[in-house]
Regions:
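Short, well-formed alpha-helical segments that are part of the catalytic scaffolds
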Residues: 14-33
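A short, conserved alpha-helix in the catalytic core of glycosyltransferases
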Residues: 171, 177, 181-182, 189-220
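Short, flexible, basic/aromatic active-site loop/helix in glycosyltransferases
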Residues: 141-164
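Acidic donor-binding segment of Leloir-type glycosyltransferases
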Residues: 28-66
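Short beta-strand-to-loop element that shapes/binds the nucleotide-sugar donor at the catalytic cleft/hinge
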Residues: 124-140
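Active-site donor/metal-binding and catalytic loop motifs
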Residues: 213-238
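Glycine-rich, basic loop-to-helix element that forms the pyrophosphate-binding segment
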Residues: 68-86
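Short beta-strand-to-loop acidic/aromatic patch adjacent to the donor-nucleotide binding site
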Residues: 91-103
Length: 284
C-alpha cells in the first residue's frame, strides 16, 4: 500500500461535459505515471456515481469514489476525502489536494513526501506554473511549449533546489498533523468555496505553536502545471460566507496572524485591513 493518497473533487458541468471530462482525463493520465496510488474522488456532479466510475476505470490508479453527484462545495468535499482516508487507509502518511486542471511529473509527489520525511513540517506545496507561464513563487516566467503539449521534461526543467515561503495547490499534508488539526470545519466554513485554505493554514500555525514562527512553504524541487487557481470564481457563490465563518472560528487575531502567514502582498494587506477594522474602537 502506498503511503501517499491523493484527493480530487470531481466537478463536471453539464453544459461543458466533454471539455471537463477531457481535462480530468489529461490530469489523471499524468497522475498515473507516478504509480498506482489511492485517489479518493468526491463526486460533485453532474455525473451519477456509476457514470463517474466509468470515466475513472481506464486509469491505473486505486480509486475510492465518494459523494453523491451533488455540488457541496470545497470544504465539505475535501473534508469528506480527508476523513475517508484517515478512517479507511491507516497506512497513508501523506495526503494531497489536487485539482483537475493540473498536470504532473512522475515523481512530484515523491519529492514532497521526501521533504516531509526529512522535516517536521505539517504541509508543503509544490511549485506551479500557470497557463500564462507564470511561476508565482519562483518570481519568474517561462514560455510554454507551443507544440507537443506540456511534458514532464519541460516541468522538470523549471525546478529549482529551493524552498520558499508560500502556499498553493497542489499541497501535501502530513496525515498525523491533519488528524490533529481536524482539517476543514464545515460548521464554520458554510460557503461553497474561498478562505478554506486560510482556515487550514491557521490550524497548522497553532499546531506548530506561535513561538515557532511557522510559515507555509513551497518546494521548488517539484513543479506542477496548474492552469488556474480560481475555478470557483464566477460561479455565483458568496465568497464572504467562508470569510465570516473564518472570523467566527479564529477571531480577529486569526486575521492578524494570516496577514503574517501569507507571502502575497494582496493577502497580507487584505487580512491586516480586516483585522484593523475589527480591532478599531467602537464609534471610530
Amino acid at each position: 500500500m502506498s503511503n501517499i493518497a491523493h484527493t480530487l473533487l470531481l466537478f463536471v458541468r453539464e453544459q461543458q461535459l466533454a471539455q471537463d471530462l477531457a481535462l480530468i482525463g489529461t490530469c489523471l493520465h499524468s497522475l498515473e505515471a507516478g504509480g498506482r496510488r489511492p485517489v479518493v474522488v468526491y463526486n460533485q456532479g453532474c455525473l451519477s456515481n456509476e457514470q463517474a466510475f466509468e470515466q475513472l476505470k481506464p486509469f491505473h490508479l486505486e480509486f475510492h469514489l465518494i459523494g453523491k453527484g451533488e455540488n457541496t462545495g470545497t470544504t465539505v468535499g475535501r473534508q469528506a476525502c480527508f476523513e475517508y482516508i484517515l478512517q479507511n487507509l491507516p497506512d497513508v502518511a501523506y495526503i494531497t489536494e489536487l485539482h483537475p486542471d493540473m498536470l504532473f511529473t512522475p515523481h512530484w509527489a515523491d519529492v514532497l513526501a521526501g521533504y516531509l520525511d526529512q522535516t517536521d513540517e505539517p504541509i508543503v506545496s509544490s511549485g506551479i506554473v500557470n497557463r500564462s507561464g507564470v511561476l508565482p513563487f519562483a518570481d519568474r516566467s517561462a514560455e510554454l511549449p507551443k507544440q507537443g503539449g506540456l511534458s514532464a521534461a519541460f516541468l522538470d526543467s523549471l525546478c529549482e533546489d529551493r524552498i520558499v515561503h508560500g502556499f498553493n495547490n497542489p499541497c501535501m499534508h502530513r496525515a498525523q498533523a491533519l488528524r490533529s488539526t481536524g482539517g476543514y470545519n464545515p460548521s464554520f466554513l458554510t460557503g461553497m468555496s474561498c478562505f478554506e485554505d486560510d482556515s487550514m493554514l491557521l490550524g497548522y500555525y497553532y499546531y506548530c505553536g506561535i513561538r515557532s514562527g511557522w510559515r507555509p512553504k513551497v518546494n521548488l524541487n517539484a513543479m506542477v502545471y496548474h492552469a488556474t487557481a480560481s475555478q470557483w470564481v464566477g460561479l455565483g457563490y458568496n465568497q464572504m460566507d467562508n470569510f465570516n465563518g473564518l472570523v467566527r472560528q479564529y477571531g480577529a487575531m486569526g486575521l492578524k496572524h494570516l496577514s503574517e502567514l501569507h507571502q502575497s502582498p494582496w493577502h497580507r494587506s487584505f487580512f491586516l485591513g480586516r483585522y484593523e477594522q475589527l480591532a478599531a474602537p467602537a464609534g471610530n
